[in-house]
Amino acid sequence: MHLTAGADINTIDAFCLRVVKNNFHVLGIDPNFSIMDTNEDKMLIDDTLTDLFAALYETENEENKNRFQHLVTTYASNRDDEGLKKVIRKLYNFIQSFPDPIKWLYDKAAMYDNNMSQSIWFKEIFLSVHKENILKHHGEFWDKLIKEMIGIVKKVYPDTDTSVPPVCIPECEQYWGKMWEYICICADSVKALKSAESFDEVGSAYDTYIAKTKLGTAVRAYKKAESPIEEWQYYSNKYNSMREDLLSSTSYLPNGTAEQFNKYVHSEELKQTIDDIVWITVLFSELYENAKAKKNVKTFSDIEHLAYRLFSENENIRNEYSLKYNEILIDEYQDTNGLQDSIFTLISRDNKNMFMVGDLKQSIYRFRGGDPTIFKKKYSLDSDEIEIIHLSQNFRSRMQVIDSINDVFRFNMSQDVGDVNYNDTAALQRE
């Protein structure tokens, strides 16, 4: 504790600002710059976008004119071009959390150069998120619903043969009417989506799902069903609710037939749109940097990028800071972004003198670029690479409170929901 008074305790912004001001001559910048507040930054971004769009509307360069018109047609409304400006703002702000924003953009655009079914987007993002995070819950729902409804039918028809596929059980169709066929289609379609490994399979399963599973009005759909109307209505409500939820969850998929779906994802238009978005975002970035340079103003994100550049390009300065700090203690590590983590890594001693404190459950700054997956990856390292200390003991609450919290967290937190596995290690303990 006696060393606390001499510790260099700062926010990441304050630390980087001091580093940059102390080394302005190495970076080749004017040390008298000022930091913009949020409103100033927003106004300068808006002004830069206005100037950029005005120039592109009037350009005589045919290639640039065509690219800009394509983007306006794709993202702007019939009233104004604010939709396209919003895309540029959002993308620009997002990439600032990476050490090299422009390189990150070009690297991601390059993923679309090859066949889409072989791209990182499809293999890692689409298949992983779509199948594991969205469809797992729905698949379990339909299986449970079918089992429950078959159980009811068996009470009425004890000799029902349940060894055949559900759709082939005549007693179920007789008892539940048309709804039974639709429920079986939903269950099979979700299973097909979960096992899909190609765009053809995804398109076909999704096409079947949206085209053939609308139950219709209760009166018409109930026709010929033997079940009591109240019982039938209960299950039809569950059916319609989950079906609408699944359609909402997969709303990012293009509507239409499997053929249209595949045409979309394999089209050159998709690749061209991505290239054009990168092109105009890079143009904006260059103009925005020039505008800030003229006013001699910077954002805290600029300061972090300058600090990163200083450490990555100057070994002597990097070593100076590395020797200065025996330990690097980072609080709220779950809200660190890729740029900040890279700065910490550069001035550490091969990561061996870093101590990170954080809680994935408290990650609330993704909208500002915080990336909790950085903490998650460190947490998953082998034990010989990192030491993990679990701060799970709670000395301020009664066991009744702790047990209630653990019950709620266990129910709502899993690897599939929230990226947090609330197991016995993560659970709160009294003693």
What feature does the model see in each segment?
Residues 79-86, 90-93, 390-431:
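Helicase-core coupling region on the C-terminal RecA-like lobe
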